Regions:
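Histidine (H) residue identity feature
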Residues: 74, 256, 317, 335-339
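Long beta-strand-rich cores associated with HINT superfamily self-processing modules
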Residues: 321-354
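Active-site-proximal polar cores
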Residues: 312
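Extracytoplasmic/periplasmic ligand-capture domains
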Residues: 2, 7-133, 149-179, 187-308, ...
Length: 354
């Protein structure tokens, strides 16, 4: 085998169906104990059904399945950096020209008030939201991630209801008509939050956040749509996003002012902060890892004062695992966003239980 060959070799690849890999007996760290693994593409319900019938040994499931029981299998809830946040447009509603010269509507007259964004961030009860939406599976998040070297250094207390209410009142958001929703200058403290119709987990999070926000006098309308519909709404409404990359450059996508209106997913909130832009440039240009990490942490510390995103949860990835298989939890690494397959990162360490 050539230099750089891994612990596995692909012996069969059927597009959109399955991949079969076989242990590399000549792997330099020793051949894996498990000799062959088959990956099968299925939707969640089909995968869960096949696990129950004994046809699958490992299956990833959404939190609504994680409290189920399957004979001969156990649940593993694995640590991630897979964060869910809601984007909160930072500029008032207005019509601007995009890079193609077309006029587009951007901004939101409610979320553009930093008092509203901060009140939500400090006022919601993340533990309650996670319990209601995700069966309690996940860890409260107040920033992008804390389990990487460049991760968010700031963790603050939430569920500060009274402080959040005072913040809103001091900013002029008052419930003057007694309907439970605050107003300011004739504008209701109300906005829409969209989640992809393909991801029920995100919709349940939006619903749980909306229920919690009522306690603050903020009305959030949880809605669903296709990704095309979501990208069309991303500059004017809240979106429940999923993020989780090992590289800190994702922070540029979220926060760099020049990226507004450039792509479908970059800085959809119209965030602009010269100090943050400068820190991002310095972090990317740095040829010293320690200095770059320091800059990325400063990026998060400075931008956190503006609350452009409402961070909710670092979800955990839930897997049913056959009792006969040891997936070596101790050598798992924090999983990235769900598009990856991180559970297999240590597949060479997996063993069959005696």
């Amino acid at each position: 085998y050539p230099i750089g060959t891994g612990a596995w070799k692909v012996i069969q690849y059927d597009t959109d169906q399955q991949i079969i890999v076989q242990a590399n007996e000549d792997y330099y760290e020793g051949a894996p104990e498990i000799k062959q693994v088959t990956f099968v593409k299925m939707d969640n319900e089909a995968a869960f059904s096949n696990a129950k019938s004994g046809q699958l040994d490992i299956v990833m499931v959404a939190p609504n399945y994680a409290l189920e029981e399957i004979d001969g299998m156990h649940i593993e809830n694995l640590e991630t950096m897979d964060v869910r946040n809601i984007s909160l447009p930072c500029i008032p509603e207005q019509v601007v020209k995009n890079p193609d010269g077309n006029e587009v509507t951007v901004g939101n007259n409610v979320t553009s008030d930093v008092a509203v964004r901060k009140a939500l961030s400090i006022g919601i009860d993340r533990e309650s939201i996670i319990n209601n939406a995700l069966n309690g599976i996940g860890k409260p998040a107040t920033g992008f991630t804390t389990n990487l070297s460049w991760g968010n250094p700031l963790v603050y207390e939430d569920n500060q209801r009274e402080e959040a209410k005072k913040l809103l009142e001091d900013a002029g958001w008052i419930d003057s008509d007694g309907d439970g929703i605050r107003e300011k200058d004739g504008v209701k403290c109300e906005f829409d939050v969209y989640s992809p119709s393909s991801d029920q987990q995100r919709y349940l999070l939006a619903v749980a956040v909306a229920e919690d926000a009522k306690e603050l006098g903020i009305s959030i309308n949880a809605k669903q749509g296709t990704w095309d519909e979501l990208t069309a709404k991303a500059n004017t409404d809240g979106i429940v996003w999923g993020w989780g990359q090992y590289s800190p450059t994702v922070l540029k996508s979220l926060l760099y002012s020049e990226l507004f209106l450039v792509g479908d997913y970059d800085n959809t909130v119209g965030y602009s902060n010269e100090e943050v832009d400068k820190l991002i440039d310095e972090a990317i240009d740095s040829n010293n890892q320690e200095d770059a990490i320091k800059k990325w942490k400063e990026v998060q510390a400075v931008s956190a004062e503006d609350y452009p995103y409402l961070y909710i949860v670092n979800i955990e990835h839930s897997y049913f695992v056959n009792d006969s298989i040891d997936i070596s939890v101790d050598t798992q690494i924090a999983h990235p966003h769900g598009h990856g397959s991180p559970i297999i990162c240590n597949m060479k360490d997996w063993k069959v239980n005696e």
